[in-house]
Amino acid sequence: MDACRPAEKRSRKPAHPLRRNISEDMKNFAENTMNELLGWYGYDKVDLQDSEAADARNRVKRNHISVLKENAVPKPLNVEKKIPPSSSSSSSSSSSCSSEPVRNGDQDPPTVPVSPSASSASPRHNMNVIVPLIKPSAVEDVQNVQIVCVWCQKEGMKRYSLLMGSELKSFCSEKCFAACRRAYFKRNKARDEDRHGDKSPSPGQTLDTPTRLMLKMNNNNSSTRVCDWCKHIRHTKEYLDFGSGEERLQFCSTKCLNQYKMDVFYREARAALTSSKEEENHPKPAATSENQTLLTPDAWESPAKSLSPQTPTASALQRTPVCMRVQMATSPKSPTGPSQGTPEQPRPPHMPLPFIRPPLHAQSLRSPTPNLPHNPPHPLSPTQRVPFAPPPHYPLPYLPLHPTFPPQMPPPWPQPMMMMPYPVFVPIPIPIPIPIPISPQNSHRGVIRSLQEPEKEPAGSQRVKTERCVSPVSASERQVIQCLRRDSVKEERNDTHIQTLRKALYTSVLTSTASASLDGRIVSPASLYSLARSTAIQAASFSLDSSSGQIPSPLSDCEDVKENSYLCGRGNDSANQWTAEQMDCQSDQSKEGKGEEETPQDVEHTYARSVPPKLREKNTHVNTQTHLHTQIWEKNTQVDELGPEQSVRDDAEPAVKRRCLRIRDQNK
């Protein structure tokens, strides 16, 4: 029949499980396996005596599959409320056992597992199945108990608890609970594998540790080792022993040992720093630290020595502030040396602490504490000294011989830098603008200057006094005016032409002597005065167009002067005036060639005509042309009989026309 069934139906499970009779061998094997698993996880051993007790315990285990389900052991008070009245006469043990199917909805009669007669006949049925479980979360929420976690040693709320015999271990989180259970499991499993006859308790246990935590197989006790740093079970036989006596520790590898040493070293360094700072403010006697026990690196090389921390005592003055004592000895305020106590004088906050330990690779895993200068019989080795510290062979009694060092001189030895970056100041040249004064004679002081500025002339020069006196303008200023004229052409006013005429006239007056001679004729101050007066009258009568904005050339300046001087001449003074104008123009051109020409200074002198550089290079040619123009004007202008005012009116238009023609030629 089975051969005719399809293949896919062979693996199908039956709808209802089949109850089979289990042999005694299988029961014993299940009991041993269950006890082994319970022992690995730190639970009590369960003994199954007969099949009925085995069935009852199996039902309890089915109801409590996992420890994390937080199901408590059935309580008689709660059970009696749910028991039917027909079974109220049964014992408490039978009611507790029979109440489980009722609570879970099973339809079996309550007296099926254990009958009242059977319970009275066998007293072992009265014992409840004790399985260590976690308390319900509702009870914990009501209590809100503050506990110290057994695993992480931190304070927190009680979340999980594990009952181990008479000891109840509490955990703050599921993570700690799982880690502790895993550690016990590995420890018990390793004990089972080792099977050596060492009955001494492991480092993580004490003598009063319950024996249920140790798995018993074939009546042989087996123990294992747990690393005191990583708290893990290693399947290695070569554990590293560290220390002796009660402080004997075991590590599974050199990595754990080194990490433990680093942790101890770090805690010792922090304790030393804290105690030294407290001692500076409030010194304490040395007897207060005798009762303290701290595992320090002192025991790394001397295991027989007592493990007591070396806290700062009264010899702290000899132990630290080497650089502090040097500064005390060198300062003029305290020349007495190190005989005075340091607690009275506050240490600067930036002072490096010389008792800070170097890293472990620099000291070869040795403690620098017992080899400091307070222990002279054992000098420091080169690898154990503090970096840049002075040698201990030169004690402090040598320092009072030289109590006062210069403040600028450094100490005889370099100060400890404590492996910190040392700033080195490197001078970097930074360009800084420095104002350089420039002499006003050789530089351009501005295009427009004030009229009140004093005039500076050579000491040997003399000047003919006129009605208006102006200050000279240097050659560089004339060049600036030349550039302004080339850039933009502005509309000239009538005063511009008046200024042009005055410029040529007044500069011609500035001669080296009061009277100049040319060709045997003398120019007197009277003739110059009359010439200036006639020029002013002629300038007042001019009316020029705005189109004549261009400034005439230096030749036109001389011609204007000649025209005005001829029109202003009277009688016999005309010849003297012509020769004076000729001489003035020549002297003006010569001074411009040398860069020493003096021009009038006025508000509108910007529009004055300056001599171009090409004409300056040809001083001889300019002087020749000026002389020829003077000869031509002497021949063409012979109107001495007319008055000065009439002559100005008659010749005003030809002069303007000639100027316009010159401007047009320059524009071409």
Curated annotation (Swiss-Prot):
Q: Which family does it belong to?
A: Belongs to the SOBP family.
Q: Where are the zinc fingers (FCS-type)?
A: 140-178, 218-258
Q: Which GO terms describe its biological process?
A: animal organ development
Compositional bias of kind Low complexity = 86-99, 114-123
User: Which stretches does UniProt call biased (Pro residues)?
Assistant: 345-357, 370-380
Role: Implicated in development of the cochlea.
Q: What GO molecular function annotations does the UniProt record carry, in alphabetical order?
A: zinc ion binding
Record-annotated membrane-spanning stretches: none
UniProt region (Disordered), positions on chain: 1-24, 72-124, 190-210, 274-388, 584-605, 633-668
Protein name per the record: Sine oculis-binding protein homolog B
Q: Where is the composition biased (Basic residues)?
A: 10-19
Q: Which InterPro entries match?
A: RAI2/SOBP
- Organism encoding this protein: Danio rerio
